[in-house]
């Protein structure tokens, strides 16, 4: 009987008293239970002892070479079992003995050697397992047979099979079984080790005995890839985090289990049946050749040879080929740099240069293809009308006949396109055959020189004609560049294959081969026909058979004269034949003229069909990316090939509209310029991607060069002006307009474009260059580390700092996550992307920097030391004032004050921002909606909001990791679901009206988002800190919101020197080139404050005083040691003057600056170790209470202002 699939079994615990686990939990599936009850009796002893790998005495069937017959890679199993660290060798030995006894009983014989070996194995394994906490058991699938068959197998074939266990991470195999040498059936067993890395059997199973995933293509697919859902490799957390207490089984080890990739493959296979995919010949080569060979081949190439001569005609063709070949190489490089989907030129450009260029080119390229349909159809209709005119069977008149025939033709072409790509491809093959026959007809005709054709200028291959036609003979104001402009549209069409990239079986291989080979073949044909027609036909001929020369002339200079024809009449009159006069030269030369007409029909219709297919496919890809939301309806596809039927209809209508005009002489140059603009950007994309040096730019096609691509882009731009300068300018204006529109709209896409790569490279290079620049006072910028916590929980703090750092200095939003490290790390990784997006969305030029620490002080230290890069490091710490310090735990207050000391220790400036209403709005549920409503109707008083009053307001500097403050709306817009949001649209708490305090808090939180009006910024520059106190208000006045505010400067001075001090300060400010409206010198700062204010201060600090004079010395010392923040009597007396100064300054602030928009004031400094935290906090409270917004600023006492140039 064949061994059945293995059942995962949980090894019993080695510690006495532990029972067997009920099952092991599987990811995404139900719990797995133990073996069938039929085997329980045979294996009870082994299981209860917790010993062997198999947990029973029945060995698996072997192959006689010491290898088990299973498991196969898809059948491998493993489970993780808790192993007691105290499990000794006795348990393992008992298990081995039980297993040996069971095996002996089943086989009917006793094998002491085997028992001994098994015992030794168990001892060794038990000691090894005792070293760790977990054991991984790999179970042989052969052991999962039914109970009856397993016993019989043990006695039969499998009796001598090996029992295999894995040790040391699964790399070394411990085998208990037959010898590697075939014996004479003595039954002797021995124990041996061998390395699985040198064993082919175990190499086959690599990757199935571990949670780690082996490299596979499914891990690198995009979620929206054609193959279905992306298969996720195990996350780092799954491999690295501590295991849960409950044993589990790795889902990746179970071969028979369904996986996302397997399901996706099945779904994709089912949906893919019948989908038409083309190879490189039918999909690219044929299309490109048909698109390149247009009407020019048959009705304009002979005229070009007549104007430019054979030599310059070859130069014209070669120049066009250079442009198209370089573009073909660039297209091949981009197409082989990753999986290419539908969208052709749009897809290539957008994924290389980004949505801005891609969106602009995609729209005009799709439009150009749609109008190109009309151009080719009108060319076809004109040829048909000429035939009708020759036979005098016009329906109405020439212009209306072109409209009627064109309309009928485009309807038929639409039917072929809508019928499906398969039918369209078949039509292309038929048209190519006709085109090739027409070319062959011309080549054959050049060797057939009929007497009737000589009067029309065709003499066959003659050296006289070749020599005469080799040089140029420009007429009617034609020049080399005008001739080149007429020919170049005949060389376009090289993107016809790339435009249907989504319908190619292997775009990466098909596009380079098909495009480059098509360019080569068509160029050879163009040059061959140019040389042939220039060697056979003279420039001018009368078509009159009577113009032959019967007598030999000795003074002949023209080739016709040497060939006995006199066409001198054409020198002074207009003739109807010859290269210069007859557009139907190829029909005249050919062996069968109607076949040339068929070739013209084939060339026009094939090009029209290719454009009719390309335009909707490009437009559909553009609409799928939602670059232009108004066109989203055209993204829908129908049928098995996802055909863009709506795009077909739109293309049909555009083409029909231009067909009805029937005059495309003005539109044609614009279309050619649209194509050339696409070529230019494709070439520039390769140059740009190579210049950015992105590791992701590694095309499989190696035959490209970034500088050649740049030359190609420049050549395309030059050719645009050569063809038509005003059309080139119009194209540039349209591309620029669309680029600006897409840039303004900022589509929510991220394609890893070279623009992003170059931005990174530029930032990296400039950062490295900046690191070598020494600091200079003239280049000082405030680079602020703002302790915001969650950035949107303190909007006033964020906006005020942003006002003086925007486009001037660095702003980093520091957020200290506290709590369990494991949870905090997960939240930090989520917050990093979430809050950075929030800052960008709210147009905040700032960086979000989360850090995990045990407490706020430690986290702030980490940020101050490590935040930033090179010279782009913070130099100023910005904090919100701790408004709730009187009710808070004084240990938190002590920690808050220590942030100041830490900042000063590492030479940081410190800025403390205080609003009397407070800064933190995170306790208000739905704050973002309220903020927007406040901006719209600030007078509203009856706002209803969910308020969580149970949450204690934390310090205005940081929040713990669990306190998030981002709305669910933002989460949905960002495309992520919050794991632990603070704010929700639907709160379970009671809905209560917003109280007055919170209403004022919300109003205050938005005050810096508005224009500040004509008011004052009062600068109390009491102490010289290097100039930071003066620099910040100046920077504020340079911003649009603050530009109407005037700076008033307050300084301290002596009563008898007020005028002198004012003049000295005015002189200094003028040297600093800082405008001010007034300077006020305060001579009464040192006056004793009002008695009631002193009493109020004493009452405030009373709960925090030590009162050591009223206590015993030991008790006082102990209390000071345990609570170092307490204010001692000695300290209070020592700093009485400084205390009075803070109280007095508050009185002066209320007197002079109560109406100011904002007050910027010198921050008092407390000596570390001398001033307690409670006293320092009391100073700040007394100084800044009941005032307009206050900035307490203290620089690091290094100059940040200078009056030297």
UniProtKB/Swiss-Prot annotation:
Protein's membrane topology: Multi-pass membrane protein
Chain spans, region Disordered: 1-102, 143-187, 953-986
Gene3D superfamilies per UniProt: Amino acid/polyamine transporter I
Residues annotated for K(+) binding in this entry: 291-292, 376, 489-490, 492
Residues the record lists as binding chloride 2: 365, 493-494, 675, 679
Activity control mechanisms: Activated following phosphorylation by OXSR1/OSR1 and STK39/SPAK downstream of WNK kinases (WNK1, WNK2, WNK3 or WNK4). Inhibited by bumetanide and furosemide.
UniProt-recorded Gene Ontology molecular function terms: metal ion binding; potassium ion transmembrane transporter activity; sodium:potassium:chloride symporter activity
Residue numbers covered by motif RFXV motif 2: 133-136
Tissue/organ expression: Widely expressed. High expression found in the cochlea, cochlear lateral wall, and the choroid plexus. Lower expression found in the cerebellum and the cortex.
Residues annotated as transmembrane: 280-309, 310-329, 361-388, 399-422, 426-447, 480-497, 513-534, 592-616, 645-665, 666-684, 708-725, 726-738
GO biological process: branching involved in mammary gland duct morphogenesis; cell volume homeostasis; cellular response to chemokine; cellular response to lipopolysaccharide; cellular response to potassium ion; chloride transmembrane transport; detection of mechanical stimulus involved in sensory perception of sound; inorganic anion import across plasma membrane
Positions contributing to Na(+) binding: 290, 293, 603, 606-607
Binding sites annotated in the UniProt record for chloride 1: 294-296, 489-490
Renumbered ranges of motif RFXV motif 1: 77-80
Outcome reported for the amino acid change (mutating residue 320 to V): Reduced potassium ion transmembrane transport
Domain notes: The RFXV motifs mediate binding with OXSR1/OSR1 and STK39/SPAK.
Self-association and partners: Homodimer; adopts a domain-swap conformation at the scissor helices connecting the transmembrane domain and C-terminal domain.
Family: Belongs to the SLC12A transporter family.
Role according to the record: Cation-chloride cotransporter which mediates the electroneutral transport of chloride, potassium and/or sodium ions across the membrane. Plays a vital role in the regulation of ionic balance and cell volume.
Protein name in the entry: Solute carrier family 12 member 2
Taxonomic lineage of the native organism: Eukaryota, Metazoa, Chordata, Craniata, Vertebrata
């Amino acid at each position: 009987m064949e061994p059945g699939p293995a059942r995962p079994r949980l090894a019993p615990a080695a510690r006495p008293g532990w029972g067997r686990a009920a099952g092991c939990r599987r990811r995404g599936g139900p719990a797995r239970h133990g073996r069938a009850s039929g085997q329980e009796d045979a294996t009870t002893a082994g299981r209860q002892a917790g010993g062997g790998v198999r947990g029973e005495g029945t060995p698996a069937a072997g192959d006689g070479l010491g290898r088990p017959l299973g498991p196969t890679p898809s059948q491998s199993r493993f489970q993780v079992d808790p192993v007691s660290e105290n499990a000794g060798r006795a348990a393992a030995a008992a298990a081995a003995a039980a297993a040996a006894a069971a095996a002996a009983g089943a086989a009917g014989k006793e094998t002491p050697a085997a028992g001994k070996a098994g015992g030794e194995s168990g001892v060794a394994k038990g000691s090894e397992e005792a070293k760790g906490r977990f054991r991984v058991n790999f179970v042989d699938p052969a052991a999962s047979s039914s109970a009856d068959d397993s016993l019989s197998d043990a006695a039969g074939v499998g009796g001598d099979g090996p029992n295999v266990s894995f040790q040391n991470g699964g790399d070394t195999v411990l085998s208990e079984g037959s010898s590697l040498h075939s014996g004479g059936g003595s039954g002797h067993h021995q124990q041996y080790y061998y390395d699985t890395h040198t064993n082919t059997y175990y190499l086959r199973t690599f990757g199935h005995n571990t949670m780690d995933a082996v490299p596979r293509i499914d891990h690198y697919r995009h979620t929206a890839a054609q193959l279905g859902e992306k298969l996720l490799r195990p996350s780092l957390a799954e491999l690295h985090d501590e295991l849960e207490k409950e044993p589990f089984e790795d889902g990746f080890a179970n071969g028979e289990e369904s996986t996302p990739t397997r399901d996706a493959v099945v779904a994709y296979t089912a949906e893919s049946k019948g989908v038409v995919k083309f190879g490189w010949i039918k999909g690219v080569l044929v299309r490109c050749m048909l698109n390149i060979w247009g009407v020019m081949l048959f009705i304009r190439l002979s005229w070009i040879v007549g104007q430019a001569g054979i030599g310059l005609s070859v130069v014209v063709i070669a120049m066009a080929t250079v442009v198209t070949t370089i573009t073909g190489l660039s297209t091949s490089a981009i197409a082989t740099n990753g999986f290419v989907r539908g969208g052709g030129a749009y897809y290539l450009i957008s994924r290389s240069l980004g949505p801005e260029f891609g969106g602009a080119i995609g729209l005009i390229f799709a439009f150009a293809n749609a109008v190109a349909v009309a151009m080719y159809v009108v060319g076809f209709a004109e040829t048909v009308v000429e035939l009708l005119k020759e036979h005098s069977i016009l329906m109405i008149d020439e212009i209306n006949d072109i409209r009627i025939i064109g309309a009928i033709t485009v309807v038929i072409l639409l039917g072929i396109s809508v019928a499906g790509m398969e039918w369209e491809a078949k039509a292309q093959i038929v048209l190519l055959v006709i085109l090739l026959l027409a070319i062959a007809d011309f080549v054959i005709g050049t060797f057939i020189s009929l007497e009737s054709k000589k009067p029309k200028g065709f003499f066959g291959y003659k050296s006289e004609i070749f020599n005469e036609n080799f040089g140029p003979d420009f007429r009617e104001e034609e020049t080399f560049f005008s001739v080149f402009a007429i020919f170049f549209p005949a060389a376009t069409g090289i993107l016809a294959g790339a435009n249907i990239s989504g319908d190619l079986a292997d775009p990466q291989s098909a596009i380079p081969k098909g495009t480059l080979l098509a360019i080569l073949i068509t160029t050879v044909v163009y040059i061959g026909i140019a040389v042939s027609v220039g060697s056979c036909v003279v420039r001018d001929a009368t078509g009159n058979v009577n113009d032959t020369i019967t007598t030999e002339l000795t003074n002949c200079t023209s080739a016709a004269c040497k060939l006995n024809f006199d066409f001198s009449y054409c020198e002074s009159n207009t003739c109807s034949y010859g290269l210069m006069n007859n557009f139907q030269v190829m029909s005249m030369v050919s062996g069968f003229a109607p076949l040339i007409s068929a070739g013209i029909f084939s060339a026009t219709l094939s090009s029209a069909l290719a454009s009719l297919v390309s335009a909707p496919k490009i437009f559909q890809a553009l609409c799928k990316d939602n670059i232009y939301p108004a066109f989203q309806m055209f993204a829908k596809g129908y049928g098995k090939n996802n055909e863009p039927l709506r795009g077909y209809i739109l293309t049909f209508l555009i083409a029909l509209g231009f067909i009805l005009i029937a005059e495309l002489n003005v539109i044609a140059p614009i279309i050619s310029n649209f194509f050339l603009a696409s070529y230019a950007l494709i070439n520039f994309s390769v140059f740009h991607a190579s210049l950015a040096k992105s590791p992701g730019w590694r095309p499989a096609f190696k035959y490209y060069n970034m500088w050649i691509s740049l030359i190609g882009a420049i050549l395309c731009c030059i050719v645009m002006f050569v063809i038509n300068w005003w059309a080139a300018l119009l194209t540039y204006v349209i591309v620029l307009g669309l680029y600006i529109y897409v840039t303004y709209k900022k589509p929510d896409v991220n394609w890893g474009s070279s623009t992003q790569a170059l931005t990174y490279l530029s930032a990296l290079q400039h950062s490295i260059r900046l690191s070598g620049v020494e600091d200079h006072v003239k280049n000082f910028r405030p680079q602020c580390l703002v302790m915001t916590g969650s950035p949107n929980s303190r909007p006033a703090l964020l906006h005020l700092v942003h006002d003086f750092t925007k486009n001037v200095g660095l702003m980093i939003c520091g957020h200290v996550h506290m709590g369990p490290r494991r949870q905090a790390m997960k939240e930090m990784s989520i917050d990093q992307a979430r809050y950075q997006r929030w800052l960008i969305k709210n147009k905040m030029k700032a960086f979000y920097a989360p850090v995990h620490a045990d407490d706020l002080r430690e986290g702030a230290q980490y940020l101050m030391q490590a935040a930033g890069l090179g010279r782009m490091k913070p130099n100023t710490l910005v904090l919100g004032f701790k408004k709730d310090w009187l009710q808070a735990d004084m240990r938190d207050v002590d920690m808050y004050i220590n942030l100041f000391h830490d900042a000063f220790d590492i030479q940081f400036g410190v800025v403390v921002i205080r609003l009397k209403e407070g800064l933190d709005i995170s306790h208000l549920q739905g704050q973002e909606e309220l903020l927007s409503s406040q901006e719209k109707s600030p007078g509203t008083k009856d706002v209803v909001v969910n308020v969580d009053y149970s949450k204690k307001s934390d310090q205005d500097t940081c929040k713990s990791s669990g306190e998030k403050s981002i709305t669910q709306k933002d989460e949905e817009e960002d495309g992520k679901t919050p794991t632990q949001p603070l704010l929700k649209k639907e709160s379970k708490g009671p809905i209560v009206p917003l109280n007055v305090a919170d209403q004022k808090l919300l109003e205050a939180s938005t005050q810096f988002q508005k224009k500040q009006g004509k008011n004052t910024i009062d600068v109390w520059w009491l102490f010289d800190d290097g100039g930071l106190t003066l620099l910040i208000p100046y920077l504020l006045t340079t911003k649009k919101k603050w530009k109407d505010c005037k700076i008033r400067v307050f300084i301290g001075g002596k009563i008898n020197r007020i005028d002198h001090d004012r003049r000295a300060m005015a002189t200094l400010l003028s040297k600093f080139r800082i405008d001010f409206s007034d300077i006020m010198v305060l001579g009464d700062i040192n006056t004793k404050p009002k008695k009631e204010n002193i009493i109020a201060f004493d009452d405030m600090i009373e709960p925090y005083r030590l009162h050591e004079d009223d206590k015993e010395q030991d008790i006082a010392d102990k209390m000071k040691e345990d609570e170092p923040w307490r204010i001692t009597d000695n300290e209070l007396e020592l700093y009485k003057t400084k205390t009075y100064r803070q109280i007095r300054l508050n009185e002066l602030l209320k007197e002079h600056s109560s109406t100011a928009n904002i007050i910027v004031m010198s921050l008092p400094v407390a000596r570390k170790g001398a001033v307690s935290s409670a006293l320092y906090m009391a100073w700040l409270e007394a100084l800044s209470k009941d005032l307009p917004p206050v900035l307490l600023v203290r620089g690091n006492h290094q100059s940040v202002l200078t009056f030297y140039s």
